[in-house]
Amino acid sequence: SVFEAAALGCDSLSSNALPVTILQCGSAGLCDDLIISEYVEGTSNNKALEIHNPTPFDVDLTPYVMEVYNNGSETPIQSLNLEGVLVSGGVTVLGNPQAAAPIINQSQALSTVTWYNGNDPIVLRKNGEIIDMMGVIGEDPLGAWPVGEGAMAEYTLVRKPNIGQGSTNWLEGQTQWDVY
């Protein structure tokens, strides 16, 4: 939301001068790093990840790595070093190289990091530290990871609009998604 106000002296306001942007940054009010904002786990190879920059600054993607862990593994089976700059408020989409044309056409990168099937943890790291994740590394849920009224298999998950901070705790993180 954008509100405009200006101080006139000490006791009145005008509604036409100073634009102030109110960021939707979650309950803690922090938007200090990238987050996974959308997860697509569709039929066959129709899979994609969207990364969002909720910060007020453009972000160099060089220190970031996206990883996927398979079936309870403690080491990633696929990883992708991110490249470029993600503008403030912008998103980048990582698509499966064998996905249908609509996913491929919207992807800024095609990567095997999208080879997941609902029970595989997805991790976003910065300088080696986890800043956001879905699922739990080293655990196999014996099905798909639960998310709201759905799961990480055969659904599209979109981060709730009031979430501006990544989660490293899946018990908390699984409540941060709208399920489609």
Language model regions located:
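Extracellular recognition modules
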Residues: 1-6
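Ser/Thr/Pro-rich, low-complexity mucin-like regions
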Residues: 7, 125-128, 161-164
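Short, exposed coil/turn segments at beta-strand boundaries within extracellular/luminal domains
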Residues: 7-15
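C-terminal edge beta-strand
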Residues: 15-25
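Activation on beta-sandwich/Ig-like modules and their edge loops
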Residues: 25-156
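Extracellular low-complexity, O-glycosylation-prone Ser/Thr/Pro/Gly-rich "stalks"
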Residues: 149-150, 155-180
